[in-house]
Design a protein with these regions (language model features):
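Non-catalytic helical/linker scaffolds that mediate oligomerization, partner binding
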Residues: 1-317
């Protein structure tokens, strides 16, 4: 079984990474939504020194994110905010596709805004659930059909150097169907890296519904519960996870479970009972891989989080 961490400021240290490997970590995810692969040469060098063997890059793909902010924003309930021109930067496709009355979920649903007015180049919204918003955080609009390309220009640049950087697998966000996988396969071939593993992230209802058509085309499925939980009432997410797990098992396709596995360990040295139970059950469901994201990238206890992930999973094996 594979255990992945996510590299970030909290673990960007050779000794910490080595301790995570000693705890059982078998690979690292690098999130390229926050910067291109070429800009992370220092992290790549750290991973080599620490003896990390597997490196997954998480592309931008058709994912919606806000742009760069001069500084983080503190948003409060009832506040009016603009997304688009003269406001929080966001994709033009979002502005052109969303209607008044629809909701916007930001940062995996931590913040919620309602669209009041749709202008030609901006959305005027009211904050329903406030919080701190940082650059490049995710955006989701339940029920909206927003057409985004499978790969961005930056994604293709990252793929062109992936093999030389030691990348072993590519994670494609928000897979909507077989066409997305074929586009990535073609891009990998053009980049001279046809042997890299493809991991399809299921993060919306389109991906859930299209799973049977692209299952034969991928090396692994990623049940990415953050944005997937924004696509449905949250109480339906556990059932969806179980159904996706069963479909992958039946097809003989490996699958990974990710997002908030040990979320409390951002700030606590010991996880909750619910979190370790979640890990244990994911293994019983047949998961071939588990991954930590913010727990290792930005949390206070990256090594301890990896220890709990590995030890709990191995107890279930």
């Amino acid at each position: 079984m594979d255990f992945y961490g996510t590299i970030g400021p909290a673990c960007a240290d050779v000794k910490l990474l080595q301790q995570m490997v000693e705890a059982g970590m078998t690979g690292i995810r690098m999130n390229l939504s926050h910067g291109p692969l070429a800009a992370h040469k220092d992290w790549l060098a750290l991973l080599r020194k620490a003896g990390v063997k597997k490196l997954l890059i998480d592309l931008q793909g058709p994912e919606l994110r806000i742009g760069r902010l001069p500084q983080q924003l503190s948003l409060t309930a009832g506040q009016t905010v603009r997304l688009g021109a003269q406001g929080i930067p966001c994709p033009a496709a979002l502005v052109h596709s969303v209607q008044p009355g629809q909701e916007l979920l930001l940062d995996d649903g931590k913040l919620l805004a309602r669209v009041d007015t749709a202008e030609p180049d901006a959305l005027v919204c009211t904050v329903v659930r406030g919080g701190v918003l940082q650059s490049r955080k995710s955006l989701a609009t339940p029920g909206a059909d927003i057409q985004m390309p499978t790969l961005t220009a930056e994604d293709k640049e990252n793929l062109a150097i992936a093999a030389d950087c030691g990348v072993t697998g590519v994670m494609l966000p928000f897979v909507r169907g077989a066409a997305d996988i074929r586009s990535l396969r073609q891009a990998l071939a053009e980049a001279g890296a046809p042997g890299l593993k493809i991991l399809a992230k299921i993060e919306n209802l389109a991906g859930v519904q299209a799973l049977p058509e692209f299952l034969p085309l991928v090396d692994e499925v990623v049940i990415a519960r953050g944005d997937l939980g924004n696509a449905m009432p949250l109480w339906e997410l556990p059932r969806c996870q179980k159904q996706l797990s069963a479909a992958c098992r039946a097809a003989g396709v490996p699958f990974m479970v990710v997002t908030q596995m040990l979320d409390s360990m951002h700030t606590r040295a010991v996880p909750t009972r619910a979190e370790v139970s979640d890990i244990y059950n994911a293994v019983l469901d047949g998961a071939s891989s588990l991954m930590l994201t913010g727990e290792t990238a930005a949390g206070q206890y990256p090594v301890q989080a990896m220890e709990y992930l590995v030890r709990t999973a191995r107890t279930a094996m």
